[in-house]
Amino acid sequence: MTKEKIIVIVGPTAVGKTALGIALAGAFNGEIISGDSQQVYRHLDIGTAKASAREQALAVHHLIDIREVTESYSAFDFVQDAKRAIEDIVSRGKLPIIVGGTGLYLQSLLEGYHLGGDLDQKELLAYRQQLETLTDTELYQLLASKGIHLDQVNRRRAIRSLELNQFARDLENQEAPYNPLMIGLTDEREVIYERINKRVDLMMASGLLEEARWLFEQYPAVQASRGIGYKELFPYFQGQASLEEATATLKQQTRRFAKRQLTWFRNRMAVRFDSISESSYPQAIYDRVERFLKEP
């Protein structure tokens, strides 16, 4: 069976994924699917770095503004929604382009976890999320307790092996449903950190404080409020930190998040990274996409 070709753009926050996605959509007749766990929420526009109205006018975007802030959203929900969006985009002769930094969501979609058959997908994804909370040492101890031996151990292989052990009959014959071209964007760490600092300053100037205050006053305990960009400002509203301190914390936590994102994609998904500072960027990516689409 021929697998549908899709483009997947990943990388740390503030590296330019949205801009590249829009450019590729224009060049290759594509539509964008957000792969970000926070951009599904309505009313949370600035802190989630959601594509602006102008940017959304340049390319059709899917899975943005599809949940109220009071609703929960999971990897299971994303897989369902993304599959429907891909089917819709392909049915109209267009190219699906997934843009986002929520690694667990993308891995769940790309690695063949189908939503039909005997396997309870909610149970599978809940088990994976449980495994993701374990340290490397705890993972390897769990492997040993189940009699699983891996010659070369990394987190991705460890988690996959534990899933197979837990759901062997349902998972062992599944294949990845898509043929993805993985595109990773990166840059020197200090350059990314400077981009993050400038982005936070721009967000604050654009109304992030008011957006965060609304969330704090109306829905302080919902899942959406736990995302980076909001909870760091809550101590200011509670009188526990100055605005300067809260903003500095937001920058620091965003930088740490970007580092975790890079580590996650490098360790757990087969991603080729391109530096946005290279003279060949973005033409080299355009050429790669063109070759990929011409392949049988």
Swiss-Prot record:
Q: Kindly list the GO molecular function terms attached to this UniProt entry.
A: ATP binding; tRNA dimethylallyltransferase activity
Task: Tell me the InterPro entries matching this sequence.
Answer: Dimethylallyltransferase, IPT, P-loop_NTPase
Tell me which Gene Ontology terms the entry assigns under biological process: tRNA modification
UniProt keyword Nucleotide-binding present: yes
Q: List the disulfide bonds.
A: none
**One Pfam short name:** IPPT
Q: Which residues bind ATP?
A: G11, P12, T13, A14, V15, G16, K17, T18
EC code? 2.5.1.75
Top EC class, one word: transferase
Reading the lineage from the top rank, the first entry is Bacteria
UniProt keyword terms in alphabetical order: ATP-binding, Magnesium, Nucleotide-binding, Transferase, tRNA processing
| Residues at the site labelled Interaction with substrate tRNA | T102, R128
Show the segment(s) annotated as Interaction with substrate tRNA. 36-39
Cite the binding residues for substrate: T13, A14, V15, G16, K17, T18
Question: Does Magnesium count among this protein's keywords?
Answer: yes
Cofactor(s), names only, from the UniProt record: Mg(2+)
Catalytic reactions on record: adenosine(37) in tRNA + dimethylallyl diphosphate = N(6)-dimethylallyladenosine(37) in tRNA + diphosphate
**What is its biological role?**
Catalyzes the transfer of a dimethylallyl group onto the adenine at position 37 in tRNAs that read codons beginning with uridine, leading to the formation of N6-(dimethylallyl)adenosine (i(6)A).
Q: Which PANTHER family match?
A: TRNA DIMETHYLALLYLTRANSFERASE
What do we know about how this protein assembles, alone or with others?
Answer: Monomer.
| NCBIfam families attached to this UniProt entry | miaA
Q: Which family does it belong to?
A: Belongs to the IPP transferase family.
Protein name, please?
A: tRNA dimethylallyltransferase
Q: Which organism is it from?
A: Streptococcus equi subsp. zooepidemicus (strain MGCS10565)
State the gene name recorded for this protein.
Answer: miaA
